[in-house]
C-alpha cells in the first residue's frame, strides 16, 4: 500500500467516525495543536491536526447527527481539546489564596475552555454552511475560524488568548507578515496553510489538482519567509540616543503584593534591587534614564504614602524617571472610605512628582472585577485581587510623555494580547511599555504565551516593546520582534538595555484589520460562488 493510499484510508476512517470516537479525535487534534504555541512553537504539527478538522467536517453529514449541528459539536470538542491544555495554568491563580479560592480551580480550568469552545463550535458550523467538496472548503474553514476567533476576541470583554494566528509567531521571519495583516490575517493564513493537505485525498480526474492547495501553501510559507528575511535585514536594531533602560524584576511572591503589613519589606527590596550594580562598570540606577517596575508593584496606594514617594525621589538621580505599576485610589477627599480602585501606571520624576498616569482600560473578568459585581458580592463571591467593589476601568488610552525619550504606549498585563490597542492615528508613540504580573500563573506555559503575544504587538505596529514582569519574563524587544535582552521566568534581577528605536508605521498600523477582512470576505464569496455553481450548473 502506497503512502497516498494509507493517507486516504486514515482520512476515510476519520470522515466516517461518529459518537465518542469522533469526539476523541477532535479533542486529540485540539490538544496536539497546542504544541504549535509558545513555549514549544512546533507549528509543523498543524500539518497533521488541521487536515483532521477538514475531514471531520467532511463527515459531519454522516452518522446520527447531521450537517451543521454535527459540525458545531465537533468544533466544540476540538475547542475543549485546544483550550484546556492551552490554559491549564489559570488554575495556579486560585492557589495564591488557596483557603478562599482553591475550590474554584476545576470550575476555572474547565469552565473558561467550555465557554471559549462555543466560538470554535460557531466557526465549524459556519464552515459547514459554506462547505464544498473541493479545495475551496479549506478557505471556507479558514474564513469561518477567523470570524469565530475575532468574535472570541471581542465578545463580552474579549479573550483572544492563543488565537490560531500565534502559531506563526515563530520563526521570526514568518511572523513579519503580521506587519501587513495583523493577528486576524495571520489566523486566516494559519488555518488555510496547515489545513491544505486535507485535499490530497480528494478524487479528481487529474491527480495534480489534489496537490494544488498543498503546493500553494508551501509556496506561501516560502514567500512569507522571504518577505520576513528581507524585512529583518532592512530594519537592523537601532537605539534611541541617550535613552537607557533599567527593568527591575523582583520575583515577589503573590501574597506579599497584597499584604499591607509587608509594605516596608517590599519597598526595601525594590529600592535595593533597582540600585544593584549589573556589572563591574555599573553604577546602579545612575546608569539609567528610565527605571521600570512591574504591574501593581505595591501592597498600598503609592501616591498616598508620602514616605514611599520620598524614598523614590531619593533613589532617582536627576534626569531619571520611574515607570511603575500601582493601584490608584479615585480622587476622593482624604478620610473617605475607598471601595474601588484603578490598576494604573505612574511616571514619576526624580523629585517625586507624578508626570503622567494611565488607568487600565481592559480589566480581567473575575480577576479585577466581577460581572454583576454588587449581586455577586452579596452572594459571597469576590475577584482574585480581593478588592472590594472591583477595579474601575480607565476611560482612554493615551501615550505617556517621557522626558529624554519618545512617548510610550502603556499596556497593563493582558491588554497586550489585544491587537489594535493603539493610542490614536495622530498620536503614534515611540515604544510600547507593558507592565505585568504573571506571578499568578507560576512556572507554567502561561507567561511564555503572554510574552509571545505581546511581542506580536511590536511586529504589528513597528514599535519596540519594553516589558517589565514581576516574576518574568521581562524583555526588551525591537520593532520587528527581535529580543534585545531578557530576564527569565522565576528569576530575581535587573535588566539594563538601551531603548530600541521605532520604524515607520507598518501597513497594519495604518489600516488595521482591513487586509484581514478582505481575505475573509474573498474566501466567503468564493465558497458561496462554488456552492451556487454546484446547485445551478
Swiss-Prot record:
Domain CN hydrolase, chain residue ranges per copy: 248-501
Keywords from the named record: Acyltransferase, Cell inner membrane, Cell membrane, Membrane, Transferase, Transmembrane, Transmembrane helix
Metabolic or biological pathway, per its Swiss-Prot or TrEMBL entry: Protein modification; lipoprotein biosynthesis (N-acyl transfer)
Location of the protein in the cell: Cell inner membrane
Top-level division of the source organism's lineage: Bacteria
Active-site residues from the entry: 295, 360, 413
GO CC terms: plasma membrane
Enzyme Commission number, as recorded: 2.3.1.269
Annotated transmembrane regions: 10-30, 37-57, 76-96, 107-127, 181-201, 210-230, 507-527
Family matches, as InterPro entries: Apolipo_AcylTrfase, C-N_Hydrolase, C-N_Hydrolase_sf, LNT_N
Task of the protein: Catalyzes the phospholipid dependent N-acylation of the N-terminal cysteine of apolipoprotein, the last step in lipoprotein maturation.
Protein name in UniProt: Apolipoprotein N-acyltransferase
Originating species: Bradyrhizobium diazoefficiens (strain JCM 10833 / BCRC 13528 / IAM 13628 / NBRC 14792 / USDA 110)
Gene name of the encoded protein: lnt
